[in-house]
């Protein structure tokens, strides 16, 4: 991930340690944009570990690239078999302070417009109570959850900050609105 940092690092490592193995895990989405990174990845890295099955198609050196699976598929243990009416709506305003500051006020307004539901605010497990009070402010309208997968599975719908959480919701089977 983060090719803006990792590609220059791989280049520097290759120049400094020409015989060392350089493994790149979670490849940049060169299939979507900036395809020129493919040649750089193949030049600087000895092994490319893909989390998306079709990524190998854009690389010329098939010996360097291996599909290793997606880490979320290992983490998520339960999936929805069908859509449910649990009367629970999940809200995930992100994990960065700016995301939370931008999205939480909107989510609080949404709560007022979607009556007769239980509103689940999913907060990253790493956040302590002091940080939560400081960053989130009044969240008394919400039930708090720090278990993303369980909360998404139990919710009939979610409003989610753009990022990995949208993939989690899609894999679990919870319909959502991507928020940015």
Task: State the predicted function of each range.
Residues 146-180:
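A donor-sugar binding/catalytic signature common to diverse glycosyltransferases
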Residues 22, 89, 119-120, 176:
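Hydrophobic/aromatic residues located in beta-strands of well-ordered beta-sheets
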Residues 46, 87, 155-157:
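Conserved acidic residues
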Residues 2-83, 90-104, 113, 124-128:
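Active-site and donor-binding regions of nucleotide-sugar-utilizing enzymes
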Residues 62-68, 87-88, 136-145:
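Active-site regions of enzymes building and remodeling cell-envelope glycoconjugates
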Residues 28-32, 73-75, 139-144, 158-160:
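Short gly/ser/thr-rich secondary-structure transition/capping motifs
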Residues 98-154:
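Donor-nucleotide binding loops and adjacent catalytic segments primarily
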């Amino acid at each position: 991930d983060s090719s803006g940092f990792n590609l220059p690092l791989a280049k520097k490592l290759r120049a400094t340690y020409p015989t060392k193995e350089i493994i790149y895990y979670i490849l940049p989405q060169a299939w979507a944009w900036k395809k020129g990174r493919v040649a750089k990845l193949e030049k600087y890295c000895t092994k490319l570990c893909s989390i998306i099955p079709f990524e190998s198609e854009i690389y010329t050196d098939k010996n360097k690239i291996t599909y290793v699976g997606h880490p979320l598929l290992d983490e998520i243990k339960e999936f929805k078999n069908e859509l449910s009416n649990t009367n629970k709506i999940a809200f995930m305003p992100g994990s960065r302070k700016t995301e939370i500051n931008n999205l939480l006020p909107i989510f609080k307004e949404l709560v007022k417009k979607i009556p007769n539901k239980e509103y689940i605010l999913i907060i990253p497990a790493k956040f302590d109570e002091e940080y939560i009070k400081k960053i989130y402010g009044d969240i008394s309208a919400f039930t708090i959850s720090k278990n993303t997968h369980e909360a998404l599975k139990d919710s009939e719908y979610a409003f989610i900050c753009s990022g990995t959480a949208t993939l989690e919701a899609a894999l679990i089977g919870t319909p959502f609105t991507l928020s940015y």
